[in-house]
């Protein structure tokens, strides 16, 4: 694919390249399943990883994977057609998640948490089925810092996301190469390159995850005083000083008498 905004493309690609190097996300011989939901983030991730692959000093393979959870109106055919036109290997997995969620969901709860857990399980299984040792997800910098704030404000933990971690199945390594890329860089990139964005078609999409939207709003307000606040929060995740925290295990590790 020939990108409209070459400068923006290079900026995002360089940021992903730094993340790959900093966190050891990709190694020679990797076969990577890239989760493509039909959103701007996953399309961007797939194209950037392909751009890096063509010039990388190591050899790796990409396989795009999409899960159709059975939500009425979800246009998985649009995703499949686009990826086929772009020359990507693509696997579409159809599930009955929508029916399961409607049956199991507690009254008043959102679809999001159940849906996410079900999708994760399928993605891990798919990665193994397709011979992939890694699964790439499209979480960007904003997702990392919003998750950090959500866990601090509502859960009481110092926890965000990891750019590289072993999945629950103990077999697949999950990577998040967009960790250094802000959402505001992805939005115009996706728009200018006319990615065929497909909404998830969830019946409560847009009303769920209100707490995350509150974090987005808070960060937007903070940026008015400190434009670098999101990157500062991200740096904090890699600049931990255990002796100044309250975790008792960390205190023992620091040999505090």
From Swiss-Prot:
Pathway: tRNA modification. A motif (PP-loop motif) lies at residues 37-42. GO terms for biological process: tRNA thio-modification. [4Fe-4S] cluster binds at residues 112, 115, 202. Its main location: cytoplasm. Its EC number is 2.8.1.-. Pfam families: ATP_bind_3. It catalyses: cytidine(32) in tRNA + S-sulfanyl-L-cysteinyl-[cysteine desulfurase] + AH2 + ATP = 2-thiocytidine(32) in tRNA + L-cysteinyl-[cysteine desulfurase] + A + AMP + diphosphate + H(+). It is an enzyme of class 2 (transferase). SUPFAM superfamilies: Adenine nucleotide alpha hydrolases-like (SSF52402). Disulfide bonds: none annotated. It is found in: Cytoplasm. HAMAP family: TtcA. Homodimer. Catalyzes the ATP-dependent 2-thiolation of cytidine in position 32 of tRNA, to form 2-thiocytidine (s(2)C32). The sulfur atoms are provided by the cysteine/cysteine desulfurase (IscS) system. The thiolation reaction likely consists of two steps: a first activation step by ATP to form an adenylated intermediate of the target base of tRNA, and a second nucleophilic substitution step of the sulfur (S) atom supplied by the hydrosulfide attached to the Fe-S cluster. This is tRNA-cytidine(32) 2-sulfurtransferase.
């Amino acid at each position: 694919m020939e990108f409209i905004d070459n400068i923006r493309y290079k900026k995002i690609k360089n940021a992903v390249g730094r993340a790959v190097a900093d966190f050891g996300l990709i190694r020679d011989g990797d076969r990577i399943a890239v989760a493509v939901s039909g959103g701007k983030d996953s399309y961007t991730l797939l194209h950037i990883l392909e751009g890096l692959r063509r010039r990388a000093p190591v050899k790796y393979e990409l396989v795009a994977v999409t899960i159709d959870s059975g939500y009425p109106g979800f246009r998985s055919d649009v995703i499949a057609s686009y990826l086929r036109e772009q020359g990507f290997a693509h696997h579409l997995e159809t599930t009955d998640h929508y029916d399961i969620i409607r049956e199991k969901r507690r009254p008043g709860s959102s679809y999001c948490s159940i849906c996410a857990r079900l999708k994760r399980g399928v993605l891990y299984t798919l990665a193994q089925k397709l011979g992939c040792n890694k699964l790439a997800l499209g979480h960007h910098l904003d997702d990392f810092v919003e998750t950090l704030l959500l866990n601090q404000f509502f859960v009481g933990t110092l926890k965000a996301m990891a750019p590289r971690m072993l999945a629950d199945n103990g077999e697949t390594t999950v990577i998040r190469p967009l960790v250094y890329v802000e959402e505001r860089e992805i939005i115009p990139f996706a728009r200018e390159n006319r990615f065929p964005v497909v909404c998830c078609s969830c019946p409560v999409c847009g009303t769920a995850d209100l707490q995350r939207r509150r974090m987005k709003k808070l960060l937007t307000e903070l940026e008015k005083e400190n434009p670098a606040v999101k990157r500062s929060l991200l740096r904090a995740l890699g600049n931990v000083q255990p002796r100044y925290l309250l975790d008792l295990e960390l205190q023992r590790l620091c040999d505090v008498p």
